UniProtKB/Swiss-Prot annotation:
Biological role: Diacylglycerol kinase that converts diacylglycerol/DAG into phosphatidic acid/phosphatidate/PA and regulates the respective levels of these two bioactive lipids. Thereby, acts as a central switch between the signaling pathways activated by these second messengers with different cellular targets and opposite effects in numerous biological processes. Has probably no preference for any of the diacylglycerols in terms of the acyl chain composition, especially for the acyl chain at the sn-2 position.
UniProt protein name: Diacylglycerol kinase iota
Tissue: Specifically expressed in brain (at protein level). Expressed in hippocampus, cerebellum, brain stem and spinal cord (at protein level). Highly expressed in hippocampus, cerebellar cortex, olfactory bulb, and olfactory tubercle and to lower extent in the cerebral cortex, caudate putamen, and thalamus. Not detected in the white matter. Also expressed in eye.
Domain of life assignment: Eukaryota
ANK repeats by residue range: 943-972, 979-1008
InterPro entries, per the entry: Ankyrin_rpt (IPR002110), Ankyrin_rpt-contain_sf (IPR036770), ATP-NAD_kinase_N (IPR017438), C1_DGKiota_rpt1 (IPR047486), C1_DGKiota_rpt2 (IPR047487), DGK (IPR037607), DGKI-like_dom (IPR056383), Diacylglycerol_kin_accessory (IPR000756)
Any GO CC annotation of this UniProt entry: synaptic membrane
Basic residues bias (residue ranges): 332-347
UniProtKB keywords: ANK repeat, ATP-binding, Cell membrane, Cell projection, Cytoplasm, Cytoplasmic vesicle, Kinase, Lipid metabolism, Membrane, Nucleotide-binding, Nucleus, Repeat, Synapse, Transferase
Catalytic activity: a 1,2-diacyl-sn-glycerol + ATP = a 1,2-diacyl-sn-glycero-3-phosphate + ADP + H(+); 1,2-di-(9Z-octadecenoyl)-sn-glycerol + ATP = 1,2-di-(9Z-octadecenoyl)-sn-glycero-3-phosphate + ADP + H(+); 1-octadecanoyl-2-(9Z,12Z)-octadecadienoyl-sn-glycerol + ATP = 1-octadecanoyl-2-(9Z,12Z-octadecadienoyl)-sn-glycero-3-phosphate + ADP + H(+); 1-octadecanoyl-2-(5Z,8Z,11Z,14Z-eicosatetraenoyl)-sn-glycerol + ATP = 1-octadecanoyl-2-(5Z,8Z,11Z,14Z-eicosatetraenoyl)-sn-glycero-3-phosphate + ADP + H(+)
Gene3D superfamilies (alphabetical): 2.60.200.40, 3.30.60.20, Ankyrin repeat-containing domain, Probable inorganic polyphosphate/atp-NAD kinase, domain 1
Motif PDZ-binding per record, residues: 1048-1050
Gene expressing this chain: Dgki
Subunit structure: Interacts (via PDZ-binding motif) with DLG4; controls the localization of DGKI to the synapse. Interacts (via PDZ-binding motif) with DLG1. Interacts (via PDZ-binding motif) with DLG2. Interacts (via PDZ-binding motif) with DLG3. May interact with RASGRP3; involved in the regulation of RASGRP3 activity.
């Protein structure tokens, strides 16, 4: 490894101005601190100039690694050879000894001691120079005797991307523009070039995270402060080392705790602190206090472990820059005579192959290593891709992270093709994944490395199938790396599309259209008809006017408008007349024509169209098997307009076949799309056949890299966890300050769950707890939490959670992170909490009353007359709801938001009549307008039915959803006075499946009976819809499971 990558890269700090603490005057490992152990003032000055002209003498410690006491200025401490401490410093002691009157014998002793200290100082300087030479810290020594700067010509433009050419410089920073406040220039006040400017452009290194002014970059290069090394120089004179040394960097702000003493780095006023508080390694992320008691000299020498993600990091010792061979005159004249006339094609081919490749990878095989290549598409997900790219550069070697907007993945995969146990992470959409899989096919790597997916943007059906979720929120990159490392390798079928001209049509009858598809291989789906027509219109409009499609919201609105327009025009209504489909020899054309499908999908994975499941889950009585992505079969599904609409609310299409080969003939130009890439294909014959199987990384539910779950003994049987909720306003303002965010949180209740409970199950319990709170809102009891630190009681929150709440991960050291709802089943409660869970409610109304900081609370109950027996733990009986939770009681004053009457009233105002008429006629716009003008949703019509009853009976899903979102929760299970039926009963009688699913998802009771004792499931059975009855029964059984898994105490 070269000199720049071997040791400690620390900022040379300026001389102390006035009294200061010892480590602030000169860092524990600043150049002055390394060589300033002088015994007199003159030797101290000489040592300071020799190593850093701008620094004064700093702290010193002996070779034994002992600690020095703090002094009042630079060079105020000096440690002796045996570790003894002289509080005044050697120079101060010698000066004081010359000034104080003493006896002759005492004076001789002092002179002898001074002579010994001089000798010791000389030996220390020699030893430090040797240590610097061994560790590669030549950048700390002056390049010129007087320390004068040397001009290197005109200033070059700061580099923002990695250099893969033969001119690449090891340890070169990657500068990105930044405007983050609170980060001071890394050079400090003494060396900063624009320290008096109020505002100056700054840049941040994406690799080591230091911030400097743009004008100070040249000064940073003069002091030779290098970034962490990413490769090593080749050549016989550079012996290979199999380990990496630390890359130490000064930090003015640092999260976490000191590796040595275990204490935090918090300061009283740390936002604009100019003091160096920590020294951290850019590789392993270990951090130490900037004190000689914590950071010691041997830390420079010791190898770096590369931290928690060492198994996926490509060490810089593996990446070698090969020097270009220089042709000498003697070598050119000494040409050996050829004794053979065999062709040298292989050698010439190798030379051509290696031409232009100054880098090679020489890995060291280890069964514990799973090196990771990260490919990021910055154009996916707005600006998410750019942020993800920078975060991976911080955690990994930048030369294993590639920006796909700069170049494709082929060169990187070719470079790393011989690395064993290689894994790939594709950060982007499904198109990015398909691009990488196609390159892997082209290179024919053996074995093929598995590919994981970090979903960016929208859609992401393949990522959903592999448990990576529908999109990236703000999950810590550290956890993503653990998930990729521990993920399960599964297979993904890939299918060929072979297109030929339709032989049944003469050339003169061929219509306009392209003669080939955009892709000849698909991983997700291949479709034709309505969905492809809508996608094609969007792509054609975006290509014609790209400036009108720069907003995700506008894109969605255009999709909706195009779909509605196509629905009215019925442009795909005759699709079944112009296609012929043969699956494994079975002709499906008659069935397609009978059912008049307007869309046909050949589906490889269970997900389609941003998460829907068109194949569904066929039962045992069907002739089809559940869908899999590795069984070598493709599913053929037909859609009418009705089934396409039902797809968004849990429905499925018409299952046609599961086959290994498809022959498709089209007799007119038809819109088609391959994995989201649309075109209008001329009449053709298309053959679909299995191509191969790709290795993919599936996100595992249990993460073996988490030490908490490694040991089965560490998982308790039961967890008692307090639930706190946080508003979006507090989260956005305080999510980097965990303590203040805890103070701003509001207690919600206490759950007692199983030790292996996941978040999906926990969500059900929290929602049920909210329902229990509302059902007893008329009680006269008030419950408080008592803070153990302040002893002040805190009333729990009475505000109902909105449907959009999500869990927060509170275990990270730096901040809270949101957890995607689609990935809740992959997280355990123990992974995101320590005795308490935090949830984020974006619609929560922030209270003006400031809360006290919550500790681990005790339950305190204010006794009320008539209820003391219920609240006595020894006498009270367990009151169970459907989910098995104890029903708490609260005082009316705590539930003032829900204290108004829930009794249905007849329409009074004109707006009330307008709302009732809008619901009966199905006019959503009129309903929204009347409600905004003051109309009530708690009105009744003829037959004493609520608005939700009418909406459920008519089957208008949009109106049902609007009432659920804006109306009180009591409407869900409210029964009419004549039949005792709830809204779910009405929808089940009318066999409105979509409405039933909306009501069930909103929390409607599945076991409430009508006046005849019938449940909604029994009503659906009587109405002749066994599928709907089976669905309601399965949802009822799913909720009953919670009885044995949950105990709630309030």
């Amino acid at each position: 490894m070269d000199a720049a990558g071997r040791g400690c890269h620390l900022l040379p700090l300026p001389a102390a101005r006035g009294p200061a603490r010892a480590p602030a005057a000169s860092s524990a490992l600043s150049p002055a601190g390394l060589c300033s152990g002088t015994a007199s003032a003159s030797s101290a000055a000489a040592g300071a100039v020799a190593m850093n002209p701008s620094s004064s003498a700093g702290e010193e410690r002996g070779a034994t690694g002992g600690s020095s006491s703090s002094g009042s200025g630079a060079g105020s401490c000096c440690l002796g050879a045996e570790g003894g401490v002289d509080p005044r410093g050697a120079g101060a002691a010698a000066a004081a000894a010359l000034e104080e009157p003493a006896a002759a014998g005492q004076k001789e002793k002092e002179e002898a001691l001074e002579e010994k200290l001089r000798d010791l100082t000389f030996r220390k300087q020699v030893s430090y120079r040797k240590a610097i030479s061994r560790t590669g810290l030549q950048h700390l020594a002056p390049a010129h005797p007087l320390g004068l700067p040397v001009a290197n010509g005109p200033a070059k433009e700061p580099r923002a991307t990695l250099d893969w050419s033969e001119n690449a410089v090891n340890g070169e920073h990657l500068w990105l523009e930044t405007n983050v406040s609170g980060d001071l220039c890394y050079l400090g006040e003494e060396n900063c070039q624009v320290r008096f400017a109020k505002s100056a452009l700054r840049r941040k290194c994406a690799v080591c995270k230091i911030v400097v002014h743009t004008a100070c970059i040249e000064q940073l290069e003069k002091i030779n402060f290098r970034c962490k090394p990413t490769f090593r120089e080749g050549g016989s004179r550079s012996p290979r080392e199999n380990f990496v040394r630390h890359h130490w960097v000064h930090r003015r702000r640092q999260e976490g705790k000191c590796k040595q003493c275990g204490k935090g780095f918090q300061q009283k006023f740390s936002f604009h602190s100019k003091e160096i508080v920590a020294i951290s390694c850019s590789w392993c992320k270990q951090a130490f206090h900037n004190k000689v008691t914590c950071f010691m000299l041997h830390h420079i020498e010791e190898p770096c472990s590369l931290g928690a993600h060492a198994a996926v990091i490509v060490p810089p010792t593996w990446i070698i820059k090969v020097k270009k061979p220089q042709n000498s005159l003697k070598a050119s004249n000494r040409k050996k005579k050829r004794t053979s006339f065999k062709r040298k094609a292989s050698k010439r081919g190798t030379e051509q192959e290696n031409k232009g490749r100054p880098f090679v990878i020489k890995p060291i095989s280890s069964p514990l290593m799973k090196p990771l290549l990260v490919f990021v598409n910055p154009k996916s997900g707005g600006n998410q891709g750019t942020k993800v790219l920078q975060m991976f550069m911080w955690y990994l070697n930048p030369r294993q992270v590639f920006d796909l907007s700069q170049e494709g993945p082929k060169d990187a995969l070719e470079l790393y093709r011989k690395v064993p146990n290689l894994r790939i992470l594709a950060c982007g959409g499904d198109g990015t994944v398909g691009w990488i899989l196609s390159i892997l096919d082209e290179l024919q790597l053996s074995p093929q490395p598995p590919v994981g997916v970090l979903p960016l943007g929208t859609g992401n059906d393949l990522a959903r199938t592999l448990n990576w979720g529908g999109g990236y929120t703000d999950e810590p990159v550290s956890k993503i790396l653990c998930q990729v490392e521990d993920g399960t390798i599964v297979q993904l079928d890939r299918w060929n599309l072979h297109v030929e001209r339709n032989p049944d049509l003469p050339p003169e009858e061929l219509e306009d259209g392209v003669c080939k598809l955009p892709l000849n291989v698909f991983n997700n789906y291949f479709s034709l008809g309505f969905d492809a027509h809508v996608t094609l219109e969007f792509h054609e409009s975006r290509e014609a006017n790209p400036e009108k499609f720069n907003s995700r919201f506008r894109n969605k609105m255009f999709y909706a408008g195009a779909a509605f327009s196509d629905f009215l025009q019925r442009s795909s209504r005759d699709l079944s007349k112009h296609v012929k489909v043969v699956c494994d020899g079975t002709d499906l054309t008659p069935k397609i024509q009978d059912l008049k499908f307007q869309c046909i999908v050949f589906l490889n994975i269970p997900r389609y169209c941003a998460g829907t499941m068109p194949w569904g889950n066929p039962g045992d009585h069907h002739d089809f098997e559940p869908q899999r992505h590795d069984d070598g079969y493709i599913e053929v599904i037909g859609f009418t307009m009705a089934s396409l609409a039902a797809l968004q609310v849990g429905g499925h299409g018409e299952r046609l076949h599961q086959c290994r080969e498809v022959m498709l003939l089209t007799y007119k130009s038809i819109p088609m799309q391959v994995d989201g890439e649309p075109c209008r294909l001329a009449p053709a014959m298309i053959r679909i056949s299995l191509r191969n199987q790709a290795n993919m990384v599936q996100k595992s539910k249990r993460r073996t890299s988490m030490p908490l779950l490694n040991d089965p003994q560490s998982v308790p049987d039961r967890l008692r966890i307090r639930v706190n909720k946080i508003s979006l306003q507090d989260y956005e303002g305080l999510h980097y300050d965990k303590e203040k965010l805890r103070e701003a949180s509001i207690p919600l209740g206490i759950l007692v769950v199983r030790g292996d409970c996941d978040l999906e199950t926990c969500r059900m319990y929290i929602d049920r707890l909210q329902e229990d709170l509302q059902s007893v809102s008329s009680g006269s009891q008030r419950v408080h939490y008592q803070d153990q630190e302040t002893s002040f009681p805190r009333a729990i929150s009475a505000q109902r959670l909105s449907p959009r709440w999500c869990f927060l991960d509170a275990t990270s050291a730096d901040r809270f992170y949101r957890i995607d709802r689609s990935q809740e089943h992959l997280h355990f409660v123990m992974e995101i909490s320590h005795d308490e869970i935090f949830i984020l409610d974006p619609d929560m109304v922030v209270s003006q009353q400031a809360g006290t900081p919550p500790g681990m609370p005790d339950l305190v109950v204010e006794q009320a007359s008539g209820l003391s027996d219920w609240w006595n733990p020894a006498l009270r009986k367990r009151m169970l709801s459907d989910s098995g939770m104890i029903t708490p009681h609260y005082e009316d004053s705590d539930l003032k938001d829900f204290s108004h009457s829930r009794v249905l009233q007849s329409p009074v105002s004109s707006e009330d009549h307008a709302i009732l008429q809008a619901v009966i006629t199905g006019d959503l716009m009129k309903l929204m307008e009347s409600y905004k003008n003051g109309g009530s949703l708690l009105i009744q019509g003829p037959g004493h039915c609520s608005l939700l009853h009418y909406a459920a009976k008519t089957g208008n899903g949009e109106i049902v959803k609007y009432i659920l979102d804006h109306g009180p929760a009591e409407l869900l299970d409210m029964a009419d006075s004549e039949t005792g039926e709830t809204a779910l009963h009405k929808a089940a009688c009318q066999r409105n499946r979509a409405v039933c699913q909306l009501l069930v998802d909103a929390g409607a009771s599945l076991r409430q009976t009508d006046s005849k004792g019938k449940t909604p499931q029994e009503r659906a059975q009587q109405a002749g819809d066994p599928d709907l009855a089976a669905y309601l029964e399965s949802r009822q059984n799913y909720k009953i499971i919670g009885h044995e898994d949950l105990e709630t105490a309030v």
